[in-house]
Design a protein with these regions (language model features):
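Catalytic domains that recognize anionic headgroups
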Residues: 1-372
Length: 372
């Protein structure tokens, strides 16, 4: 039970009849925590292959935005009736509508997202393995993790790391919490600290958002982004009308839309010296009162789609399209294709032209659009 509570701490917030059978779920649905053997190396044979479009004029630069608690159903890019993505709608992005998460909590999803194993095998593993970021570094890329959340859950243990709460920038931070835009305020300075010889080959930056972390949704957005009012301003969601909870949550999506547009804007400024691209995907979703459920953390087998279906957005600069020969038009034509976090490891390696025996082309969702 203690293991359950560590992995599903969000459950204590649930306003949900399922709480009464919570102990039963512990016995019947959730596997016991498995013993982990020693760390296993992965992708030691990784190297940079020639990109499909040839030798790059400028090194590739990928920003991987790791979203927090964003659900696909609340993105207007995916058909939500409220305009929560006004800025991304103006960019040449692809928003994938049918993406399944590895889990229903950050602790469960995040390590799985960076693993080569996929959700089913990750849950069964008997050893820990190096991850996507290790393989990228084995190939020679510079890698940076910028964290505006509760840490990287061990995924950046061997990667240069910046915790934004340590930056003490008052224009972005109050106490230990900062707006996600603080990462853009510091990214240039932090990139300059990475080894120059690696940056000359290419760079991958992970930006881990505060995003839509609840239940205090109202704390995630500045006043100018409170588009939907009145919003719930209580961390006990039962004290608010459901409409107020939804307003507060939707405002966090509006701010994420702004942040992602700012990331794209920053990447465009790098085109003189880099070949930029962005990949955004959330770790898990969120319940907002559907069937009287709130927040997240239900065991996967009984979790509703609001907790398991997450937004994923890609942006490729014209230079990156030419380099990778991956067409945004083709990606947009496949936006409703069922995908999952299982695709991330292989898709990022494929996009960055990493050749390794652990890469599986059939799991690379970019591969289907190469040369099309």
């Amino acid at each position: 039970f203690s293991s359950l509570m560590r992995n599903y701490t969000e459950m204590r917030y649930q306003i949900n009849p399922l709480n009464s059978v919570y102990a039963v779920l512990d016995m019947t649905v959730i596997p016991a925590e498995r013993p982990r053997g020693p760390m296993q190396s992965l992708g030691g044979d990784a190297r940079m292959a020639l990109h499909a479009g040839g030798t790059p004029k400028h090194p590739p630069l990928l920003v991987f935005v790791l979203g927090e608690t964003a659900r696909s159903q609340s993105f207007s890019l995916n058909g939500y009736q409220r305009d929560t993505n006004p800025r991304l709608a103006l960019e040449n992005v692809t928003s994938f509508t049918q993406v399944s998460a590895c889990g229903t909590s950050t602790a469960e999803s995040l390590p799985c997202m960076f693993s080569h194993l996929g959700r089913t095998n990750f849950a069964k593993r008997s050893n820990e393995f190096e991850n996507m970021l290790d393989v990228l570094q084995h190939a020679g890329y510079a890698v940076l993790w910028m964290d505006n959340q509760s840490g990287c859950k061990g995924q950046c243990a061997r990667t240069p790391y910046v915790n934004t709460s340590d930056l003490k920038l008052p224009e972005y931070c109050q106490g230990d919490e900062c707006r996600d835009t603080v990462m853009l305020a510091r990214v240039d300075a932090e990139l300059a600290k990475l080894p120059a010889e690696r940056r000359a080959r290419g760079t991958v930056v992970v930006m881990h958002q505060m995003g839509s972390h609840g239940p205090a949704y109202f704390k995630r957005t500045p006043a100018e982004f409170k588009k939907f009012t009145p919003e719930c301003t209580d961390t006990s969601l039962s004290q608010c009308d459901r409409a107020q909870v939804i307003n507060a949550y939707d405002n966090t999506i509006v701010f994420t839309d702004y942040f992602l547009s700012r990331v794209i804007g920053w990447l465009k400024t790098q085109e003189k010296n880099s070949t930029p691209a962005m990949l955004y995907v959330s770790d898990h979703g969120e319940s907002l009162g559907e069937k009287n459920m709130y927040l997240h953390g239900l065991p996967y087998s009984v979790a509703p789609p609001e907790q398991t279906t997450v937004p994923m957005v890609t942006w490729l600069s014209p230079g990156f399209e030419q380099l990778s020969r991956v067409s945004t038009r083709c990606l947009q034509a496949q936006r409703d294709k069922p995908l999952s976090h299982d695709n991330l490891f292989h898709s990022v390696l494929g996009l960055m032209a990493v050749k390794t025996s652990v890469y599986q082309r059939e799991r690379d969702f970019f591969a289907a659009c190469e040369g099309r």
